[in-house]
Amino acid sequence: MQLPAMSCSPSQSSAAAAAAYGCCQRILLASTSLPATGRPARLGLKLRSTHSLQIRNRRFVCQAMTETEPDGDGNGDEEKEELGDDASSPSVYSVTQENGSAESETNADNTKDETVNTEPLSSSDTVQNIDGDATPASDAQENVEVVDVAVGSPLPGMKQQLDESVRIPKATIDILKDQVFGFDTFFVTSQEPYEGGILFKGNLRGQPAKSYEKITNRLQNKFGDQYKLFLLINPEDDKPVAVVVPRQTLQPETTAVPEWFAAASFGVVTIFTLLLRNVPLLQDNLLSTFDNLELLKDGVYGALVTAAIIGVHEIAHILAARDTGIKLAVPYFVPSWQIGSFGAITRIVNIVRNREDLLKVAAAGPLAGFSLGFVLLLLGFILPPSDGLGLVIDPAVFHESFLVGGLAKLILGDALKEGTKLSINPLVLWAWAGLLINAINSIPAGELDGGRIAFAMWGRKISSRISSLAIGLLGISALFNDVAFYWVVLIFFLQRGPISPLSEEITEPENNYISIGVAILLFGLLVCLPYPFPFDPSQLTDFDL
């Protein structure tokens, strides 16, 4: 239907425009009126998109030709209110399609008005489809991006310390990719979001230590202390990965019992077991210990020597940690009925900077303990037993250690014969106990000193395999040795790891530190392995076939 063109003079008032609108409305109503039968009483509109809505919309422009005439239906004011801001233009109107209402005189059908709006739909609008169901109009307009995240933390061996997951927003991830990382440091190719952070895969450029420093500075400038960066090795493909986590997920675990109280309690028990270990009479009958406490004074000298070796071990850890900026928790001395003590368990509280720093701290304890223990062991073999302190033993006891047995054969010579009792200075056994405590802590397993040394030298993947092998061999030894049995139980429940991630795990330590680490592992192995050769050369014929 085409309306005839109309014109009006510029002097006509806005009332004429309203009258013209009423005229146009009556023409439109006449053209869109539906019969009472044959078509539905209500006109159903199905809007598929904003584009189709605009195509179906009808807009009529009416220009007044005559003087103002009265509005026939009197609905002009109400419809102008519905039009809102669009009604401010007197010559352009959005026209309402009506199928009849209770107030309409031209149609007797009881149907409600259907309004077509030419404005774009907002996200809160709904549109009725042909079946009368309401559907959101924003389905075709909303661009909501849903990011799936993996459970837990992207860091190896880290647990989520918070009750609720802390996710990094997508806007922050984009800033990290585009502005924090870059071609000169770490070129990101993909990312894997987690509840506790995000893991970036890509290509590392330049030296890892320098790249880490650059990325950390950019991260600090963009977000302050909100996030923490880690450069690790992906165990799946041995390629570098970058991990960014919120610092609040790195909060240390809290314990119900204060650390100093627990450490003091373990320390008191350890002192008692060190004294008890050096009193053979009480070892045979532990139940009589509290009835014969005065006998414990006989074990003071031996307890002091062993405690000195353990103490030097822990002091070396503390000094090395202070030099590298590593914070250590209070050491827990573990008591042992067999050798007096298993040494101390010392947790690392903060995040270690790199593998070389970890190697310095982990190797410092065994290096100091082995050094003091070895010197005291040599003195024990060299010094003759003094009056009242000589200890008579069977030389077969030296077969339990390759190092001690070899030194005994080298120093004592022909005096060392199978089946012949031998009087030695008790300093040998006291120092031997200290060496054994250092040796079992140097086993490359879990979070022991040896496990940390292996991790620092060869990385997480290789050290985890060595740790599994060491624990397996230790478990086999536990079938024949009670010390090994208790030690493997202790490792499994308290020290099995994994080791907490370092800030930068890619850079290897310097060769001189690696040499020290290898020497410590070998020395501990010599202390623990048995001496297989007979002390008397004449007995070699017993092994001939």
Swiss-Prot record:
It is found in: Plastid, Chloroplast membrane. It is an enzyme of class 3 (hydrolase). GO terms for molecular function: metallopeptidase activity. Keywords: Chloroplast, Hydrolase, Membrane, Metalloprotease, Plastid, Protease, Transit peptide, Transmembrane, Transmembrane helix. It holds the Pfam family Peptidase_M50. The keyword rRNA processing does not apply. Residues 66-142 are annotated as: Disordered. InterPro entries: EGY1-like, Peptidase_M50. Its main location: plastid. Probable membrane-associated metalloprotease that may be involved in chloroplast development. This is Probable zinc metalloprotease EGY2, chloroplastic. The lineage of its organism: Eukaryota, Viridiplantae, Streptophyta, Embryophyta, Tracheophyta.
